[in-house]
């Protein structure tokens, strides 16, 4: 999948100085390229037989929605604070460039539902790790993680549950 790197724009010093942001928007505007990424993910995730895909705000929603639709399974949104109605469960976590909080609706899934967590990019693993813990806290059975892009030098996999499935398609 390295040939798809040319569709990912690098933006220096965004969102903070010293960060090189990987912008995936050029992929989303090219249907053939996006399809080339979605089919392998769809095939891999389908073998795990999840009940839901959980997408992380906000860029994780894009592909998670498409995958949930294609796999005919439910979509769960993991959001930043004060974006979800009703009772929520939350967790604070550290980012590569600061600190943040994620929330999930308290009764969004049946207990022990199999959940595949999806985000567009794996960096330090802080966001994905926090989201995975949140799924467990909400009663879900986290079965794995899937990402479009991984920044391998940041060793984000080390902050994820090593007993679970972890898949990325494009590695930097």
UniProtKB/Swiss-Prot annotation:
It comes from the Bacteria. It catalyses: AMP + diphosphate = 5-phospho-alpha-D-ribose 1-diphosphate + adenine. The keyword RNA-binding does not apply. GO terms for biological process: adenine salvage; AMP salvage; purine ribonucleoside salvage. One of its GO terms (cellular component) is cytoplasm. It is found in: Cytoplasm. Belongs to the purine/pyrimidine phosphoribosyltransferase family. This is Adenine phosphoribosyltransferase.
């Amino acid at each position: 999948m390295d040939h798809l790197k040319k569709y990912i724009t690098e933006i220096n010093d965004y969102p903070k100085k010293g960060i090189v942001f990987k912008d995936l928007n050029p992929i989303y505007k090219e249907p053939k390229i996006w399809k080339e990424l979605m089919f392998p993910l769809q095939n891999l995730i389908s073998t795990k037989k999840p009940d839901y895909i959980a997408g992380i705000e906000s860029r994780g929603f894009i592909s998670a929605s498409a995958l949930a639709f294609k796999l005919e399974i439910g979509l769960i949104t993991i959001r930043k604070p004060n974006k979800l109605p009703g009772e929520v469960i939350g967790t604070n976590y550290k980012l590569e460039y600061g600190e943040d909080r994620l929330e999930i609706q308290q009764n969004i899934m049946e207990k022990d539902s199999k959940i595949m967590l999806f985000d567009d990019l794996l960096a330090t693993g802080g966001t994905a790790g926090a989201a995975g813990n949140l799924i467990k806290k909400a009663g879900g059975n986290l079965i794995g993680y899937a990402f479009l892009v991984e920044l391998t030098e940041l060793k984000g996999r080390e902050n994820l549950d090593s007993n679970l499935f972890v898949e990325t398609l494009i590695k930097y």
